[in-house]
A protein has these predicted regions:
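ABC ATPase NBD coupling module
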Residues: 9-25, 49
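Conserved ABC ATPase signature
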Residues: 76-80, 84-86
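ABC-type ATPase nucleotide-binding domains, specifically the catalytic core motifs of the NBD
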Residues: 13-14, 37-57, 66
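Conserved small/polar residues in nucleotide/adenosyl-binding loops
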Residues: 170-172
Length: 172
């Protein structure tokens, strides 16, 4: 398949966005933090490497407070929990305020007791920043809660794509 974004097309065969215009971030099911950097350095790394201007990025302090990770900024990945690492990875992907955010099971490692709170905060961040986001998840509640549009894929085929409240799981 392909994705059209701001007049540019991305596909597995062709990416036609010039490097200086690429603002795509991603976060995986497994955190991808660099073990030799602190959490703070991991989060800021994307913005620094891409020379993102402050007016283009999401406010660092606001982001770490929303994701409740201010207490782990000076720690290394091996010193924090899986849920904290997942939230730090999410912060790193959001800090650049990308045009497109790709998330693969972004909250799978977050404790259930904390998951709904993070979903609420993530929804707020995505809504306020107007980031186009594609989330792959097995958690239908998460998809319906976070998504303005949801697709249901079964046997590698898109069965439905609509507003979450219009989808029917019965006929699948």
């Amino acid at each position: 398949g392909s994705i059209a974004l701001k007049g540019n097309t991305l596909s597995s065969d062709n990416i036609t966005i010039e490097p200086e215009k690429r603002t795509i971030s991603l976060a995986f099911q497994e955190n991808s933090l660099f073990p030799h950097y602190t959490v703070k350095k991991n989060i800021l790394l994307g913005a620094e490497r891409n020379e993102i201007k402050k007016d283009k990025s999401i406010n660092f302090e606001e982001l770490i407070n929303l994701l409740d990770i201010s207490h782990i900024l000076n720690k290394f990945p091996h010193e924090i929990s899986a849920g904290e690492a997942q939230r730090a990875s999410l912060a790193r992907s959001l800090i650049t305020k990308p045009d497109l955010l790709l998330l693969d099971e972004p909250l799978s490692n977050v404790d259930q007791s904390f998951k709904e709170e993070i979903q609420e905060k993530l929804k707020k961040i995505l809504k306020n920043s107007k980031i186009t986001t594609i989330i792959v998840t097995h958690d239908s509640y998460e998809a319906f809660y976070l998504g303005s549009k949801c697709g249901i894929i079964l046997n590698q085929e898109l069965k439905q794509f609509d507003d979450p409240y219009n989808l029917s799981l019965i006929h699948i």
